[in-house]
């Protein structure tokens, strides 16, 4: 026996096993924070794939775009946006900003418009303790599919049965007019979807006006270009303000570093670029916090002036207090 007897018993070779099974699932995507005395909750509607960036950002050079994307450790052959729905509890009102893609237009149209990872807002809101019946105002930044198609279900029933819907008169008229089913292929489903969703609330529509409050503490600000009636919303409580910027800028690198680049889904790309540059400049100068619908989850942060454009500075996520 000798030295061999002193060795510990070694079992025969066995396949390696993990100490726990792989979960292969994600937790609900919601985040809560404070804006003064208001309580804000961001809930994800999922990811929105746009495909290769070159046809989407129309007046940019491929070389410059590739350099920016590589510098941000992003793929150069695909563009994927987040969709960050915001709910603000003012103590008197529970306001949802934009509805996500929803299911109103059926599985095929929803997948064609938003890809396979969208329409998750309601599940994430419920996980955060918020039900559709509690919402008393849906403030729509504009009437595109990923912002208003969640107002009704596939049968046309109201998803938010106790809510009014705030939208600009310009967007309401434009996106419910069959005469605008021309130009890019997306125009026909966008118009059909807006008609179905906004039409269901025709007796509960509130027309937003530039500079006017939709409820105390929440002010609509015109930001035209992406659509004719696109608005952002300034949310103020105490000495704190966060601006929900809707689709002012879709990409946190390309349209922030290069705000004058154009986006193919803009109704008026040049006006959109001017509006974006002007507002980002104001946010940077005034150190205004913003919540962007399409920036990386949860979309909360600031912009800082950098060269001919700006840089996106995300707010660190606080997981211990509401702030």
Predicted regions and their residues:
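Conserved beta-strand hairpin/beta-sheet module of binuclear metal-dependent hydrolase folds
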Residues: 29-128, 232-248
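Active-site metal-binding loops of divalent metal-dependent hydrolases
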Residues: 45-46, 99-102, 143, 170-171, ...
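Metallo-beta-lactamase
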Residues: 116-130, 134, 161-222, 271-278, ...
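Histidine-centered catalytic micro-motifs
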Residues: 138-148, 224-230, 291-297
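Divalent metal-coordination and catalytic microenvironments
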Residues: 37, 88, 98, 135, ...
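N-terminal export signals
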Residues: 1-19
